[in-house]
């Protein structure tokens, strides 16, 4: 990597990466101020020390309370920025998020909207409820290396026994799409085909799942028992309760719910000391590899501990593809391999549901990556 001149950066890749240009908008490729880091060391991110190149700069930061940004007069397009200051509040509870919104304390929510409040809010303030496609998949992650989950029959039974329609339409009821794979079908560069089982009725899926469990040695007299891990969240708890009930009702699997705080939850998944875990992945960039690369055998994000030479080989071929049609076909093949191996239990493709005050102008919600920039917004007189 080298700077050719003040406005040109040249990057030489070790191998062809057709989607490289999409990676450049990811925060990990943002430039950092060398002089500020050398001067302030670990305190270079503090207000007064940090140097930014965006429309806003850091004014105040109180850990676990708020982050305040103010308009940057040195931003190249500062003349087009309207909002002078924006405050971000770290709110962990979905219900608290809505309550603070309704009290007038905040102008826009960020968390998942509470299941029990969504329909009520749609009736009471329909113009303030925004629901848009989001490049994320909610799924249950199976520990592919731990017996008995290293048996594809057991993994497939869990996949088939999950009633996505009930989860999406009855439990969550916010417009999410039932998922049949890992990569959302509306991802740029994806032309995915639905697997055969997705066209079956839930009754047929349950029958096939029971057959597979019986082949693996599990019956009504000797049922499969699993621990379902989820991180602390109102939503994840409700979905975990529903999932455990569905697996019990549909295919006779006994489920014990295990709750952990976020950091412990991540450690448990990385260490592989779990059976099945709540999981979700949101794209870092709008291209299938943002999902598929996380399932490579050597990926640090592969907490399903899925190891497939066949899948790895397909993904290696995508880098050698000479045109978009070839890559698209290989992405489809890779998804089919994940489905054949039942590496995960896909549940639904997200929508982004949030509350936005009517006086917030410029918010569209149309970016599937949810890149929402305050510099594009304004406040209408009210």
Please place each PLM-identified region on the residue numbering.
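Structural transition elements
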Residues: 177-215, 233-238
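Gly/Pro-rich hinge or "lid" segments in bacterial periplasmic/extracellular proteins
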Residues: 2-7, 13-85, 211
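Ligand-site clamp/hinge motif
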Residues: 65, 72-120
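Ligand/substrate-recognition segments at binding pockets and active sites
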Residues: 63, 206, 210-283, 324, ...
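Extracytoplasmic/peripheral linker and loop segments enriched in polar/acidic and small residues
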Residues: 1-4, 202-203, 254-265, 270, ...
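Alpha-helical secondary-structure segments
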Residues: 6-12, 54-55, 83-85, 135-180, ...
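Bilobed periplasmic-binding protein-like "clamshell/Venus-flytrap" ligand-binding domains
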Residues: 18-24, 52, 215-235, 277-280, ...
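Long beta-strand-rich cores associated with HINT superfamily self-processing modules
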Residues: 354-382
């Amino acid at each position: 990597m080298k700077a050719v001149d003040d406005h040109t950066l040249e990057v030489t890749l070790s191998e062809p990466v057709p989607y490289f240009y999409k990676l450049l908008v990811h925060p990990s490729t943002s430039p950092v101020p060398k002089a500020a880091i050398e001067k302030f060391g670990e305190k270079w991110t503090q207000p007064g020390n940090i140097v930014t190149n965006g429309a806003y700069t850091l004014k105040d930061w109180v850990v676990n309370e708020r982050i305040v940004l103010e308009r940057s007069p040195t931003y190249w397009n500062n003349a087009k920025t309207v909002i002078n200051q924006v405050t971000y509040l770290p709110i962990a509870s979905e219900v608290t998020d809505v309550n603070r919104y309704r009290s007038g304390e905040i102008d826009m929510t960020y968390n998942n909207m509470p299941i029990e409040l969504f329909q009520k809010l749609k009736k009471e303030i329909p113009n303030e409820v925004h629901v848009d496609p989001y490049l994320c998949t909610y799924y249950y992650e199976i520990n592919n290396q731990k017996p008995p989950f290293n048996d594809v029959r057991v993994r497939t039974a869990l996949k088939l026994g999950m009633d996505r329609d009930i989860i999406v339409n009855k439990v969550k009821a916010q417009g999410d799409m039932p998922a049949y794979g890992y990569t959302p079908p509306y991802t740029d560069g994806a032309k995915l085909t639905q697997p055969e089982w997705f066209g079956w009725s839930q009754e047929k899926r349950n029958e096939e799942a029971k057959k597979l469990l019986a082949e693996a040695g599990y019956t009504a007299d000797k049922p499969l028992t699993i621990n379902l891990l989820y991180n602390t969240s109102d939503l994840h708890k409700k979905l975990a309760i529903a999932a455990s009930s569905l697996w019990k009702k549909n295919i006779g699997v006994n489920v014990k719910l295990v709750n952990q705080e976020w950091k412990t939850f991540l450690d448990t998944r990385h260490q592989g000391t779990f059976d099945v875990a709540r999981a979700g992945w949101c794209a870092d960039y709008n291209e299938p590899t943002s999902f598929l690369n996380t399932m490579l055998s050597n990926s640090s994000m592969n907490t399903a501990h899925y190891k497939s030479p066949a899948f790895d080989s397909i993904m290696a071929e995508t880098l050698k593809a000479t045109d978009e049609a070839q890559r698209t076909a290989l992405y489809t093949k890779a998804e089919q391999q994940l489905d054949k191996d039942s590496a995960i239990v896909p549940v639904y493709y997200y929508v982004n549901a949030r509350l936005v005050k009517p006086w917030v102008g410029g918010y569209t919600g149309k970016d599937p990556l949810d890149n929402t920039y305050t510099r594009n917004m304004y406040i209408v007189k009210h």
